[in-house]
Amino acid sequence: MLYGEKYDQLYFASTRTPKGAGKDKEETNSAITGQRNNDLFLVKQDENGAWLAPVELEDEVNTEFDEGTPSFSKDGNTMYYTYCAQDPEGPRTSEIYISSRSSAKWGKGTRANIVKDSVTALGHPSISPDGKYLYFVSDAVGGYGGKDLFRARVVGSDFGPMENLGPDINTPGDEMFPYVRDSVTLYFASDGHPGMGGLDIFKATLDSTGKW
């Protein structure tokens, strides 16, 4: 995720062993890939346009479990990201977490209160530039296929009901990785729409009636 007025900051997820903050924290490997779980990193450009060494985000965000797919509020002080814990006694599921930045440091991530249960998977958050809606992926009951795209209105520190983006966006396949460019333009990946094979990138535009 590129960020900054000059797009000179890049936030990304990686399984690399960190060299900076958090390197001594307890770690676990993914039960799916067997690799080290993903953490979030930041890399910046210097005044000459060269990328500096990546730095791991604070332990308040990165844990021994998976973190990924960050999205930022317009002022850059709120980060939404995917958090996926491993529970030996139950299914592996993903949730959306929120972290606030103060004095150039990210605070402890907290669960976004979008669903009441702990079974429905949520992930790949993308906050609209105007801050009104959070777009995300879910396997919630009543969708059109495997994983669908949803959105929820941001109401202060809470969220309104989940809204499925409908059959023009969602298919019997999987739709994932939404990115809202300007509050009316949505980019996403899908293996259900006709394409080149597997996940392809698609674009949709919101019309004046609120329909994609």
Task: Please place each PLM-identified region on the residue numbering.
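Short, conserved micro-motifs composed of acidic
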Residues: 1-212
